[in-house]
């Protein structure tokens, strides 16, 4: 449903079964899905192809549709971009469920291309400016283009949207880059005919979370603990930000904190679990940054906070602190 093992595990314990895994691999064959089954569309949304498949089976797809409204906002903007004859540039991870869904919905009304990062954006920009061949471009983006995509004509007018859990600063930097490319090719007087301003599609929940993390980076903390699903895109970006300044421990629940001397945590870049001992400094007071991904339940963050407080007997009771707020 979301990229959080605790939430998904709870759902499974209540009898929910997942049709696909997070990489789109089939867990339950479509042939097993019947018209009287309840199919819940997750927060990421789903592709038009899957929606149509379910509709053909007589499955109700709207009654249990939990697609995030900010994801739907991106789809609506992509539809408008297509109506205005712009190509939709999607900043996202090509295999992520949300990006696959956004790509499907965008391609319904506009040419669409996925760029993973600024390096991908620069490759597109180099083609637009005439510095890369058509063959090279098509090879680099062969699995990231909508059917029939023609780079010679489909990159004359572009608008950038994103997988809503990507770093907002990165999406904005990519949009700014494409605007600069169009300025260089077509001139300031023609920019509106070649570049659409789409900054209002950024998800405020993810953006607020990231902005709050930037503020935490201004503190003099001793370490950071980030709580969230290990396959959560938005949580991984929070971890990435915290690692710029603090020793950072990425955990999915309070159970990963084994004692005041041992913590089990996730090394996201290398996709492996690590065990760190003596993670708490031998000093007082200890300053800990505690934050989480947007998909992490507040109750889980509370449990982590209380677990950490267990190691500091002199700490003020949470109840008395809450009264001040």
Residues covered by each model-derived region:
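The feature marks the mature, well-folded catalytic cores of soluble enzymes
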Residues: 1-325
């Amino acid at each position: 449903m979301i990229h959080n093992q605790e939430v998904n595990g709870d759902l499974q314990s209540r009898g929910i079964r997942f049709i696909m895994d997070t990489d789109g691999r089939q867990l339950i064959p479509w042939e097993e899905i019947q018209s009287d089954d309840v199919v819940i569309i997750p927060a990421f949304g789903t592709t038009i192809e899957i929606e149509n498949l379910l509709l053909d089976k007589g499955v109700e797809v709207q009654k249990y549709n939990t697609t995030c409204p900010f994801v739907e906002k991106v789809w609506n903007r992509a539809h408008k971009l297509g109506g205005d004859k712009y190509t939709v540039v999607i900043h996202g991870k090509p295999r992520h469920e949300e990006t696959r869904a956004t790509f499907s919905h965008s391609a319904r009304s506009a040419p669409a291309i996925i760029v993973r990062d600024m390096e991908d954006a620069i490759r597109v920009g180099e083609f637009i400016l005439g510095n890369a061949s058509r063959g090279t471009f098509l090879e680099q983006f062969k699995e990231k283009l909508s059917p029939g995509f023609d780079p010679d004509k489909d990159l004359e007018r572009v608008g950038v949207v994103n997988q809503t859990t990507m770093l907002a600063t990165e999406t904005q930097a990519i949009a700014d880059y494409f605007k600069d490319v169009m300025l260089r090719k077509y001139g300031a007087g023609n920019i509106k005919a070649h570049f659409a301003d789409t900054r209002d599609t950024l998800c405020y929940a993810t953006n607020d979370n990231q902005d709050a993390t930037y503020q935490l980076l201004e503190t003099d903390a001793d370490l950071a603990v980030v709580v969230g699903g290990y396959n959560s895109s938005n949580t991984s970006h929070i971890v990435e930000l915290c690692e710029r300044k603090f020793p950072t421990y990425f955990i999915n629940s309070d159970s990963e904190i084994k004692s005041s001397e041992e913590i089990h945590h996730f090394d996201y870049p290398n996709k492996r679990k690590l065990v760190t001992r003596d993670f708490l400094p031998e000093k007082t007071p200890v300053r800990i940054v505690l934050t989480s991904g947007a998909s992490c339940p507040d109750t889980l963050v509370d449990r982590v906070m209380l677990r950490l407080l267990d190691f500091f007997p002199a700490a003020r009771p949470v109840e008395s602190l809450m009264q001040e707020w």
